[in-house]
Amino acid sequence: MKGIFNAKIAAEFTPPKTWVLQKPLSFSTRLLAKNEVNLLRQIGVNVSSHKSLVMGKVTCVEGMQTDLASVPRIVWAVISPWDVARAAVIHDHLYASLRKYFHSFNSRKSEWRRARKLSDNIFLWGMQSAEP
C-alpha cells in the first residue's frame, strides 16, 4: 500500500456533474520527500508533514467541489470510478491548486511540470491504495 485515506467519501451530488464534500478527506503517504511537501505547500495545496512519521498528508476541506473520476461509463467494467473516487478527489484538489498558483504567478514551466508529475504520482499512489 502506497498510502492511507482517513475515511470514505461523504459527498452530496449537485447536478449536472459536481459533488461537494460533506467532510474533509485526507491521503497520507510516506513517499513524499521534504522538497516535494514544500513544492505542494508553495502551490497552495493543503499538505502537512509529520517529522516523527516522515509522512506527508494532503487534505481536501469540507465544501470542496469535485467531479470525482471523470471515467467514461463504457470503461467502468475495467476501472470503476467508485474504486478510485477518493484518489480522484485528492487529485482534483492538487490540480485546482496547481492551476490557481500558476495562473496567478506565471511560474516557470519546469516548476509546472514537476508539480504536475508529483500530483499525478499522488493520484497513482491513491489509486494503488484504493479499496472499493
Task: Give names to the regions the model predicted.
Residues M1-P132:
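Extended terminal accessory/targeting regions
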